Amino acid sequence: LWDQCSWIIETVSEKLELKQAIFKHLDESVPTTIPIGSNSSGFPISKIALGLKTAQRMMGAHYFMPAEVVPLVEIVLGEKTDPAIAQQVCQLYREVNKKPVLVKKDIPGFLANRIQHALMREALSLVEEGIASPEDIDDAVRYSFGFRYAAVGPMTQKEISGWDGMANAAKEI
């Protein structure tokens, strides 16, 4: 049974006790050479794997919906996750045309959701302050940097346009 298995991922509903029970069972029954992941959207992997004997092989593996279309998978290191095992899992995802990103600390919201929520907080603030309509905010994102970010991320874009210019503009914003 386990000879053909290179990775296990849990995808049950967001109930911490359920995830912990499944991880406890996997910890006890799955060969220690097989990494185990959780697709949790919010629970830290360190909480899910708390007290387990083989927590070094456990990590978050957060997909984005629809998972069959969106290539990103966040690989989230828990407090005890072995980074070398996480790199092996990243390679498995690359082999199936997914784009893994390594989140080196087990923080709430992981990486992409934190960036998304920062944008949403500012968008809601602009609507609440009467600066723009929701439709205009959507258009501002869709027809400017949203379109551009599909080609290059924010860090690469600033590298291209110049960090000094961004720093000067940020003083005014």
Residue spans of the language-model regions?
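Rossmann-fold dinucleotide-binding core
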Residues: 35-113
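Short acidic capping loops at alpha-helix termini that bridge into adjacent secondary structure
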Residues: 4, 32-34, 55-57, 135-136
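Helical "substrate-binding/catalytic lid" subdomain
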Residues: 106-173
